[in-house]
């Protein structure tokens, strides 16, 4: 697990439960179509796996 991940929010948080909202905010995403880069590690991958319906992930 090396390299970086490009994570983009593609779905809105309206109507989502609080746990999913907190995960998205913890990743640093604040609005739709916003993109952030994180290192590829187990903590980040665990967060992404809980909200695959809200984000897209690409390796950089």
Swiss-Prot record:
GO cellular component: cytosolic large ribosomal subunit
Taxonomic superkingdom: Bacteria
InterPro entries for this protein: Ribo_uL30_ferredoxin-like_sf (IPR036919), Ribosomal_uL30_bac-type (IPR005996), Ribosomal_uL30_ferredoxin-like (IPR016082)
One Gene Ontology term from the biological process aspect of the record: translation
UniProt keyword annotation of Glycoprotein present: no
Keywords in alphabetical order: Ribonucleoprotein, Ribosomal protein
SUPFAM superfamilies from the UniProt entry: Ribosomal protein L30p/L7e
GO molecular function, one term: structural constituent of ribosome
Keyword presence, Zinc: no
Subunit composition and interactions: Part of the 50S ribosomal subunit.
HAMAP family hit by this protein: Ribosomal_uL30_B
UniProt record similarity statement: Belongs to the universal ribosomal protein uL30 family.
Protein name as annotated: Large ribosomal subunit protein uL30
Gene of this entry: rpmD
